[in-house]
Amino acid sequence: MFFSAFLTRIYLVIVTIFLVAVIAVWFIPRSDISVHAERRPAFDLTAFFDGKTVAYGIFEDRFGNLRRQFRVEIDAKREGNMLTLDERFLYADGEQDRRIWRIEKNIIEGEAVYTGRAEDITGTATGRIAGNTMSWRYEITLELSGMEVEVRFDDFIYQIDKDMAINRAYVSKWGLEIGSVTLVFLKDGLAAQKLPLDLKSW
């Protein structure tokens, strides 16, 4: 009896440790972008996206399986402290989509803070920049398996040079990571080689 109870306790301890480890991985916080403050080139959201941008991306589930691939053409327009990004998407399965971001820059306690809205965004997106890195967080309604599901995006945009930036976005639901997006933005000379982008057929 005593030995059986002892084994039961050991089993419960092992299960608890396993669950804590799994939860820690799923809920692990993303890095504070302040650690990138000295990285160059310094990212300027408005300057980088001004004009036309092309981008290529993939979506992977949390197991690393490729689920979707897509390309995007982005037209940007500046008006004062407001930046409008008109994004047009084409997915490999032929689906087309469009999202228009309206992003405003404000200075709060000496720090630039970005807020953005789009039709399919719940509430307001918020963003900050440190060095070559921008964090951009928002909740969005996506259609998954024929159902509309609200998920959270934690985006990190890293400017590599004047013509290129890489976006890593972590997608979560109820705090659990369900997938990630990798997106490469191309500007100026690199973008010119791809324009006009075919957004009608893959």
Where are these regions (language model features)?
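Central antiparallel beta-sheet cores of small beta-barrel/beta-sandwich binding domains
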Residues: 56-144, 156
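Edge/loop elements at the starts and ends of beta-strands within beta-rich repeat scaffolds
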Residues: 45-51, 129, 160
